[in-house]
Amino acid sequence: MGDYMFKKSHLKYVKISIIIFIFLCLILVIYYNYKNNKSVKTNAVPASNKIIILDSGHGLPDNGATGFYMTSEQEINLKITLKIQKLLEQSGSVVLLTRSDENGIYDISADTIREKKISDIKNRVNIINTSKADILISIHLNKYAASSVYSGWQTFYKENNDESKKLATAIQSNLNKNVDNNNDRIPMKIKDVYLIEKSNIPSVIVECGFLSNKEECENLKKDDYQENLAWGIFLGIQDYFEKKES
């Protein structure tokens, strides 16, 4: 009888301990989500279940622009893109990448640099137009060799496409508010860019900053600055879909 009562009492203690442990875990999760303003509730965001293509500009052997300290555009493009991907997937979006590592996506039959670039861009367009995606965001960096004074991001949208303009406006606005409200640039229409011209969905290029500006180049190499850019772009995407569906 004594052993039975001891075992029963011990079992009750174990159950209570488990309940307390689960309760404490829930409290910690709630506290973490409260403290971390970049945590996302999947069922509360407009882009949930949307298909979004993220295009990381360039890719080896095409480095894109080169900035101070031999900073490679293609490398930073990819880092920002992967951070946006993480935020979107946490929010329930389906994310497709045109490239997921440092390499371009040219055909193996392409031999010269020129052939690889042409093959790469055509393959990107094919991914976009066969994906049934809702939007395309192409991530790039700017460079102006004649002057180092220019800095800041700017969005560019597909000409004669109202949805592209709305998307570019939402992203530009949220970047300005969440990264640097001194940036007063507005979205610009763009033409003669093959990827944007040939895409059959709302398409935007985000030039995330100038590698020709030393201070901005240093910032663009920093993980936390890339996180801020990704967060601003993420919020812009949410803003676009919220207005589209309202």
Write out the residue ranges for each language-model feature.
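Conserved hydrophobic/aromatic pocket- or pore-lining residues that grip, position, or stack substrates
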Residues: 54, 77, 171, 206, ...
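Short, charged, low-complexity patches
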Residues: 77, 164, 168, 222, ...
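Active-site-adjacent mobile loop/cap segments within catalytic or ligand-binding domains
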Residues: 183-246
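N-terminal Lys/Arg-rich, disordered targeting/topogenic segments
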Residues: 1-14, 20
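Catalytic-core regions of hydrolytic enzymes
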Residues: 39-52, 58-166
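Active-site-adjacent substrate-binding region
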Residues: 162-189
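Hydrophobic membrane-insertion alpha-helices, especially the h-region
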Residues: 15-31
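Hydrophobic single-pass membrane-insertion segments
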Residues: 30-39
